[in-house]
Amino acid sequence: MSRFLICSFALVLLYPAGIDMYLVGLPRIAADLNASEAQLHIAFSVYLAGMAAAMLFAGKVADRSGRKPVAIPGAALFIITSVFCSLAETSTLFLAGRFLQGLGAGCCYVVAFAILRDTLDDRRRAKVLSLLNGITCIIPVLAPVLGHLIMLKFPWQSLFWTMAIMGIAVLMLSLFILKETRPAAPAASDKSRENSESLLNRFFLSRVVITTLSVSVILTFVNTSPVLLMEIMGFERGEYATIMALTAGVSMTVSFSTPFALGIFKPRTLMITSQVLFLAAGITLTVSPSHAVSLFGITLICAGFSVGFGVAMSQALGPFSLRAGVASSTLGIAQVCGSSLWIWLAAVVGISAWNMLIGILIACSIVSLLLIMFVAPGRPVTAHEEIHHHA
């Protein structure tokens, strides 16, 4: 079992590493490529677009051909495009490389969640996804620090070579450690089981909405945090970095505590707790009389996301044994596109950073609480749990 956990964690971590590690080198990248920093900030969106594009096909391929045939090319593409970005001499080539890099990371991301669906029962999967969420929270803190240390002695290209090395490690794990987990195709007489795993299932759709809104909350916070903390609250850059590190610490602590909480409380209880924390954060930020109270509201956001997201993802994947890849892709596409659409629309309409965050917090909590209360899970699928045979 440990091999599947190690491989899944490694496959997922390419996604945040590809986002956070290069940011520290952005000024030098812009100077070398004769582009403005503003022009290269689109590299973040381009990378996410590549991930979303990968999710359109990766899940279906993983369900038909297996997890390894998607993970291996995905990791290989991530390696090649990381090297390509390091060799780019124009901003156009750099952005093209970033799109393809996101494509590779997206393939790996989809496979990771499909593997966990294949090999873990509902309760263990919820615990593991909570741990994975905590580990993912470490990357936005550690990646820029690692990037800064690398750039003390090496040029910005070394950041992408470091990503390539990470990709090589994932490729080696996928080739030699990971074993195939895709369940055997059902016999002709059992096709009804495959047909019953519909993406239009009410319970699955409710969890898609909940996880998409939750991701929208956390990404809205990340995107608006410089404005909120430095422009509105007046913190210095160093203080901003410290606050963000502390919020990551809150996320990690809650994420690592959630598996223990699942041994005491029902998953539904933790999901309700998550949304109540979001609602409390929205109210706190609305009526906040001081910066200290506002910072407390921000910690509630991080705690709320960490306590509920892994559980919601586990529940979303629960009904799917034969279509776990497609389900994982659907979740990923909805989360990436839904959160990006909200942030873009809010910016176009001219909603302030403060109101943007408060609005999504309150909307997420109200909609999600209603869905948790009134959309119950169907009959669990368990026949495929614990893979004992591998292709």
Curated annotation (Swiss-Prot):
Q: Which UniProt keywords apply?
A: Antibiotic resistance, Cell inner membrane, Cell membrane, Membrane, Transmembrane, Transmembrane helix, Transport
Per its UniProt record, what InterPro entries does this chain match?
Answer: MFS (IPR011701), MFS_dom (IPR020846), MFS_Efflux_Transporters (IPR050189), MFS_trans_sf (IPR036259), Multidrug-R_MdtL (IPR023697)
Q: Which residues lie on this side of the membrane: Cytoplasmic?
A: 1-3, 63-68, 114-130, 179-198, 266-268, 314-330, 377-391
* PROSITE patterns the UniProt entry points to: MFS
Q: How does it sit in the membrane?
A: Multi-pass membrane protein
An example GO biological process term is: response to antibiotic
Q: Which residues lie on this side of the membrane: Periplasmic?
A: 25-41, 90-92, 152-157, 222-244, 290-292, 352-355
Recall the GO molecular function terms of this protein's record: transmembrane transporter activity
The record describes the protein's role as: Confers resistance to chloramphenicol.
* Name of this chain's protein: Multidrug resistance protein MdtL
Gene coding for it: mdtL
